């Protein structure tokens, strides 16, 4: 694959979970940073014919993740398809429950119940050169606000306050500074975390 002729897309969503004026973040072992809970959207089998026609190539070990190399000439049509929401995930429950109940198992799904998810900002396509991957890239991220009951808030607070989990609370100031104090050590917060502070609407369009 000639990287110069492709744009790497990673289409994802981040959860803005706010309790007592602080935001819930999770530790990323890969980067040793704290970041919002979130994940990559998946596309469905029904999208495969279009993606093949556009010349797209999977960029991840999971071939249905929307981490994908798109030929530059196909970017406008691919962006239109993303904005349509057709043949891909448009809900957020899967990643939330995977992170909170399956991978980490610090909460009981039967006791916790189902929170309310509201997308407050659409991701937008802004193509930039990624110095790490050495390729033109676009990382549209939807921001999803999670509304919790008082009981759900208390359950999460107990998990965080135990100090034995990958979760922490960070203030808006921490997030803007890009670092937070954890167990007496200053730990970086991922730069993309600032996006959960944004609530102004943006549409998924080609920038």
What are these regions (language model features)?
Residues 1:
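Extended, Lys/Arg-enriched charged tracts that mediate electrostatic binding to polyanionic substrates
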Residues 4, 67-84, 135-207:
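Nudix hydrolase/Nudix homology domain
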Residues 10-11, 139:
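Short, surface-exposed coil-to-beta transition loops
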Residues 11-19:
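Short beta-strand scaffold segments in enzyme catalytic cores
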Residues 21-108:
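Conserved Nudix-box catalytic region and its N-terminal flanking loop in Nudix hydrolases
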Residues 98-153:
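Acidic, glycine-rich loop-and-strand cores that form catalytic or ligand-binding grooves
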């Amino acid at each position: 694959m000639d990287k110069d002729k492709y744009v790497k897309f990673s289409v994802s969503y981040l959860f803005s979970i706010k309790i007592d004026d602080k935001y819930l973040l999770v530790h990323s072992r890969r980067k040793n940073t704290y970041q919002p809970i979130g994940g990559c959207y998946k596309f469905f089998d029904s999208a495969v014919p279009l993606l093949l026609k556009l010349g797209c190539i999977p960029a991840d070990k999971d071939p249905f993740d929307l981490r994908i190399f798109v030929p530059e000439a196909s970017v406008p049509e691919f962006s239109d398809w993303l904005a349509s929401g057709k043949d891909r995930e448009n809900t957020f429950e899967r990643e939330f429950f995977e992170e909170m109940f399956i991978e980490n198992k610090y909460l009981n799904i039967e006791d916790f119940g189902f929170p309310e998810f509201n997308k407050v900002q659409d991701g937008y396509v802004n193509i930039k050169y990624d110095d790490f991957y050495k390729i033109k890239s676009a990382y549209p991220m939807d921001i999803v606000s999670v509304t919790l009951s008082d009981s759900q808030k208390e359950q999460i607070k107990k998990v965080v306050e135990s100090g034995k989990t990958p979760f922490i609370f960070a203030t808006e100031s921490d997030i803007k500074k890009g670092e937070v104090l954890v167990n007496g050590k200053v730990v970086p917060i991922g730069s993309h975390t600032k996006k959960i502070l944004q609530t102004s609407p943006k549409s998924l369009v080609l920038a």
